UniProtKB/Swiss-Prot annotation:
Protein family: Belongs to the dUTPase family.
Residues the record lists as binding substrate: 71-73, 84, 88-90, 98
Species annotation: Shewanella frigidimarina (strain NCIMB 400)
Reported function: This enzyme is involved in nucleotide metabolism: it produces dUMP, the immediate precursor of thymidine nucleotides and it decreases the intracellular concentration of dUTP so that uracil cannot be incorporated into DNA.
Name the UniProt record assigns to this protein: Deoxyuridine 5'-triphosphate nucleotidohydrolase
Gene that encodes it: dut
A single MF term (Gene Ontology): magnesium ion binding
Known catalytic reactions: dUTP + H2O = dUMP + diphosphate + H(+)
Pathway(s) it belongs to: Pyrimidine metabolism; dUMP biosynthesis; dUMP from dCTP (dUTP route): step 2/2
């Protein structure tokens, strides 16, 4: 069952100068977000900037959240990644989606108006409950942490 989530277009260039966000294929998990800036901007090496997307959101359903993820080509080809690595949008957030862009490369990068810079996807949320305990049952795996299961 699909839960309808309404995204509000708050920048009139979306749908006119630039296409509405869409899923590229029937199997696409995310849709691209664009840089809805007023003029092209240079992001210097190591600089982080906050970029408006022209889209506002209110998920409203507490069993869902939105996440903003990087586009692989931006990071691999240009060193442009999300400044916070992943943006988590809680169901009760209401407002414009902003993208924190970080230039991790050693070269300036020019972000043009309407460039696709991140992607948005929706995920289910399960909220945990807590129980105070005196002991915890062990398992075959045990408490091994990072790297415990090896690489082979």
């Amino acid at each position: 069952m699909k839960t309808p989530i309404e995204l509000k277009i708050i920048d009139s260039r979306i749908g006119n100068e630039f296409p509405l966000p869409a899923y590229a294929t029937p199997g696409s998990a995310g849709m691209d977000l664009r840089a809805m800036i007023d003029t092209a901007m240079v992001i210097e090496p190591s600089q982080t900037v906050l970029i408006p997307t022209g889209i506002a959101i209110h998920v409203a359903d507490p069993s869902l959240a939105a996440v903003i993820l990087p586009r692989s080509g931006m990071g691999h080809k240009h060193g442009i990644v999300l400044g916070n690595l992943v943006g988590l949008i809680d169901s009760d957030y209401q407002g414009q989606l902003m993208v924190s862009c970080w230039n991790r490369s050693d070269k300036p990068f020019t972000l043009e108006i309407g460039d696709r810079l991140a992607q948005l996807m929706f995920v289910p949320v399960i909220q945990a409950t807590f129980a105070v305990v005196d002991e915890f049952n062990s398992s075959d795996r045990g408490e091994g942490g990072f790297g415990h299961s090896g690489t082979k």
